[in-house]
């Protein structure tokens, strides 16, 4: 069974984990409503790619 050869300090451990990070969502400006929304998703008004896909 594998065992650690040296102790990893708290700072080394946190530095390693600090590179993992979080991804920022891709937010775009909606042309029809002028509001921000997540890219490649239907807007709350039901418009996607300039076309009405969900009737309200």
Swiss-Prot record:
Keyword field: Ribonucleoprotein, Ribosomal protein
Keyword field contains RNA-binding: no
Protein name from the UniProt record: Large ribosomal subunit protein bL32
InterPro entries per UniProt: Ribosomal_bL32, Ribosomal_bL32_bact, Ribosomal_zn-bd
Protein species of origin: Leuconostoc citreum (strain KM20)
Stretches for region Disordered: 1-23
GO biological process terms, semicolon-separated: translation
GO molecular function terms listed in the Swiss-Prot or TrEMBL record: structural constituent of ribosome
Lineage of the species this protein comes from: Bacteria, Bacillati, Bacillota, Bacilli, Lactobacillales
């Amino acid at each position: 069974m594998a065992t650690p050869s040296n102790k990893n300090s708290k700072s080394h451990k946190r530095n390693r984990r600090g590179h993992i990070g979080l991804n920022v969502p891709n937010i775009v400006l909606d042309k029809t409503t002028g509001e921000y929304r997540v890219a490649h998703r239907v807007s709350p008004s039901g418009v996607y790619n300039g076309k009405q896909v969900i009737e309200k």
